[in-house]
Each structure stands twice: as C-alpha cells, then as structure tokens.
Amino acid sequence: MTTTHPALTAGRPAGYVPRLKQYYREHVVPALREQFGYRNVMQVPTLVKVVVNMGVGEAARDAKLIEGAVRDIAAITGQRPAIARARKSIAQFKLRAGMAIGAYATVRGDRMWEFLDRMLTLALPRIRDFRGLSPKQFDGHGNYTFGLTEQVMFHEVDQDKLDRFRGMDITVVTTARTDDEGRALLRHLGFPFREN
C-alpha cells in the first residue's frame, strides 16, 4: 500500500480527482477506444508528464535573471523548478560550462492534470489574437511541444512583480505510439488545434 505525504494532500477532500482526469476517464477513454478499436483499456494513450522549460540566455551575463524564471515556473506549476546548466563553454556567447541558463519543472500525477486544466481553460484563452495551437509539432512518437511567448497569461504570475517577459516551452509526454493517436488524445482533452 502506498501512502502520500500529508503536505501533498493538504486542503483536498478524500477521494479528490482532478476535473480533467475525471473527464479523461469518463469521456476520452471510450471515445479513443471507439476511434482506434482498442480492445483493452490499458492500450488507450494517456498522459505521462508535462515539462515546462524556460530558457534564460541572458543569465550568462546577469545571474540574477535566473531567479525570475525560477519564481515564475514555481508559481505556474506549483513546484520548485530545477536549474538547467550549460554543458559546454562557448566563447562567442560568453558562456562557461556549469553556468545557469534556464529552469525547468517536470509535473506528473494530479498536479499535471490540474496544470493542464488551468492552462487550457484559463491561460490559453487570455492570449491576444490566439488562433489555436499548431497540429504539426508532434515528435513522431505522440509527444507534443509548443511554445508560449510570455508568462503573463497564467493567473498565478503576479504582473506587478514581473521583471521582464519570458517565453516558455511546454512538452506534453503521452503513451501514444503515433502522432495521430497523440493528436486525437490531446484534441479530446480540449487542446485547441488549428485547422489547416
């Protein structure tokens, strides 16, 4: 029997299931089984993790800039991000191996479902002139990566304490074997893909 740490379940009622996860179980799984003809429920693609990455190239010149990225990702994802460091020294960019050049957080479990729910229902609709996500940014194995130009569309980021606008990359890792399966999964979950 596994137990979860009390700090992770604080403020949640017993038996709590995130809204998007519940929707996945009740609506998306039957729809995908019908669409692709899966015989077993375990064959249906699901979400594994979401990686939020914020590259801060200017941190090579000013080390304090990385703190803003760490603060923003922590507010958006609800967990402390890891610092990405340079692997090689590149003289043209005034970069030395080991310098902090970005921050990233890997979100799994219920936090992942809650993050995606907030992103799809609150953050993406706040983007000005938003025409939808590109349906072509799959990696060949059902995983989807897209970029956002600024972090202010998330309600968790305090706009008064914002030092600068930072873009971010978000990767959604799935168990889908093909891009078509991954695209169908994300479309059923509510990802607003553009029609070509």
Curated annotation (Swiss-Prot):
GO CC aspect terms: ribonucleoprotein complex; ribosome
Listed InterPro entries: Ribosomal_uL5, Ribosomal_uL5_bac-type, Ribosomal_uL5_C, Ribosomal_uL5_dom_sf, Ribosomal_uL5_N
Protein origin, superkingdom: Bacteria
UniProt entry keywords in alphabetical sequence: Ribonucleoprotein, Ribosomal protein, RNA-binding, rRNA-binding, tRNA-binding
Gene3D superfamilies: 3.30.1440.10
GO molecular function terms attached to this record: rRNA binding; structural constituent of ribosome; tRNA binding
Example GO BP: translation
Oligomeric form and interacting partners: Part of the 50S ribosomal subunit; part of the 5S rRNA/L5/L18/L25 subcomplex. Contacts the 5S rRNA and the P site tRNA. Forms a bridge to the 30S subunit in the 70S ribosome.
PANTHER family cross-referenced by the UniProt entry: 60S RIBOSOMAL PROTEIN L11-RELATED
Family label: Belongs to the universal ribosomal protein uL5 family.
HAMAP family the record matches: Ribosomal_uL5_B
Function: This is one of the proteins that bind and probably mediate the attachment of the 5S RNA into the large ribosomal subunit, where it forms part of the central protuberance. In the 70S ribosome it contacts protein S13 of the 30S subunit (bridge B1b), connecting the 2 subunits; this bridge is implicated in subunit movement. Contacts the P site tRNA; the 5S rRNA and some of its associated proteins might help stabilize positioning of ribosome-bound tRNAs.
Protein name, UniProt field: Large ribosomal subunit protein uL5
